[in-house]
């Protein structure tokens, strides 16, 4: 039988959430979260033990991301880091590798690729984005043999406690406040219904399930109908092409069934491109992506050539905006002006360099945001520390971040000024029940 444990969010989170945009209560197993490569979550947090470097000391930074088909923003960020700082194999600083598209089924490969970074004697930090299942197990192995390496976990897809204990720093989107604000944004954009597209595996991820529960409750409070839909998990045998084909074939029937004033949201990157294309063609609404970015799905969905604009987010967003407006999505489709995955990856690269040279502190929120700001001029990043739902303890090494929603043809929506009601900060949900409910939702899971 599954072990269940109720953990409650401290009221201390409420005050912090007035400043930003993730957390609430859930029922989770904080010992083992799915298959983690055969390793239990560490009972005690471990941190890197490194010496401050001098100018000229060798420094390599490892980056592990998904492939361009599953995680384009993170992949492009790693390539940009190589362009800026050089390839480690050619005398530069950055060593980049990718984990398999079917990382859930090929978890040992994922673990081995991350751990292999530590074989480089000049490796000083390893950054994983997105931190898919297997990341914590890999970090534990690295810590055992190379305690001097700084370990950075970005957008964790494993148990929260496990991610925090095995990493020196965890950065993620603020999904609790977004759970409310995305629904508020959808209503402001004209939606009367909200369709949440996912699959059971994603609903076993604590913060994604929590966000979904908050979205459903927010729909009740704000007068929208909440619709739960399934689409195939790309990590199953159906793969990315099959999952994308399913969304492409079903988005118009969903719009026909639920109406054009339905806001569609998906939790998977691979689903995003066909969803965007279908939403525009059908005249529906799309607030923002799971991991918002102008290049998450939009360029391919609307045939926007941005190759000569790499890293110039204002230019990229302007080109995407033209295409979206031309496709009829003005005022109905949005994103963040700067990519979360891209910004966090490059910001983390700069942060660890400053930390290794004794110029910044790894878990200092101002330092973290300053490094991200190097790539997001004009963005107003909001940050808050995650609070453990069992103990009420503020986690100094777990920072949650957010931006305002940018609506094409309209501009910023002002979601950063929306106060999230207190009830969403203290919700109690059953993680197992949410996953089981998702298994019964309309659509196919690929399992």
List each model region and its residues.
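An alpha-beta-alpha
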Residues: 78, 175-228, 352
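Hydrophobic alpha-helical segments within soluble ligand-binding/sensing domains
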Residues: 45-49, 54, 168-196, 246-249, ...
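Bacterial lipoprotein signal-peptidase II cleavage site
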Residues: 23-35
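Periplasmic-binding protein-like
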Residues: 61-65, 120-132, 149-154, 195-198, ...
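Extracellular/periplasmic periplasmic-binding protein-like sensory domains
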Residues: 218-226, 273-357
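Hinge/cleft segment of the Venus flytrap/periplasmic-binding protein
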Residues: 44-46, 317-447
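Flexible loop/hinge segments that line or gate small-molecule binding clefts
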Residues: 141-173
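Extracytoplasmic "Venus flytrap"
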Residues: 42-111, 127-133
């Amino acid at each position: 039988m599954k072990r269940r444990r109720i953990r409650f969010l401290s009221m201390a989170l409420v005050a912090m959430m007035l400043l930003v945009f993730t957390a609430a209560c859930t029922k989770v197993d904080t010992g083992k979260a799915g298959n983690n490569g055969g390793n239990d979550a560490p009972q005690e947090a471990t941190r890197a033990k490194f010496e401050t470097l001098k100018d000229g000391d060798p420094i390599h930074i490892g980056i592990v991301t998904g492939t361009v088909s599953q995680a384009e923003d993170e992949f492009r960020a790693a390539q940009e880091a190589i362009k800026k700082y050089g390839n480690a194999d050619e005398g530069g600083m950055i060593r980049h590798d990718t984990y398999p598209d079917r990382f859930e089924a090929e978890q040992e490969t994922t673990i081995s690729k991350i751990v292999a970074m530590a074989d480089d004697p000049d490796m000083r930090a390893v950054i994983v984005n997105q931190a898919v299942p297997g990341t914590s197990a890999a970090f534990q192995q690295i810590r055992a043999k190379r305690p001097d390496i700084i370990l950075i976990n970005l957008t964790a897809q494993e148990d929260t406690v496990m991610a925090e204990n095995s990493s020196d720093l965890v950065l993620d989107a603020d999904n609790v406040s977004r759970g409310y604000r995305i629904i508020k944004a959808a209503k402001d954009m004209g939606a009367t219904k909200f369709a949440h597209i996912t699959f059971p595996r994603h609903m076993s991820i604590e913060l994604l399930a929590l966000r979904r529960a908050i979205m459903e409750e927010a729909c009740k409070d704000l007068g929208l109908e909440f619709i739960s839909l399934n689409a195939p998990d790309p990590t199953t045998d159906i793969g990315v092409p099959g999952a994308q084909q399913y969304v492409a074939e079903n988005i118009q029937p969903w719009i026909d069934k639920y109406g054009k004033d339905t806001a569609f949201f998906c939790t998977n990157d691979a689903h995003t491109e066909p969803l965007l294309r279908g939403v525009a063609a059908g005249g529906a609404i799309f607030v923002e992506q799971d991991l918002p970015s102008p290049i998450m799905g939009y360029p391919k969905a609307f045939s926007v050539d941005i190759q000569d604009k790499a890293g110039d987010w204002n230019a990229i967003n302007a080109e995407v905006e033209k295409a979206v407006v031309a496709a009829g999505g003005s005022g109905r489709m949005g994103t963040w002006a700067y990519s979360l995955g891209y910004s966090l990856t490059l910001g983390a690269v700069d942060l660890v360099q400053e930390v290794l040279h004794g110029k910044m502190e790894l878990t200092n929120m101002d330092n973290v945001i300053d490094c991200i700001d190097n790539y997001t001029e004009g963005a107003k990043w909001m940050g808050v520390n995650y609070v453990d739902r069992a103990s009420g303890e503020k986690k100094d090494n777990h920072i949650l971040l957010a931006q305002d929603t940018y609506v094409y043809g309209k501009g910023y929506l002002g979601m950063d000024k929306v106060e999230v009601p207190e009830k969403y900060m203290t919700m109690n949900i059953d993680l197992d029940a949410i996953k089981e409910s998702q298994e019964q939702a309309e659509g196919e899971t690929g399992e």
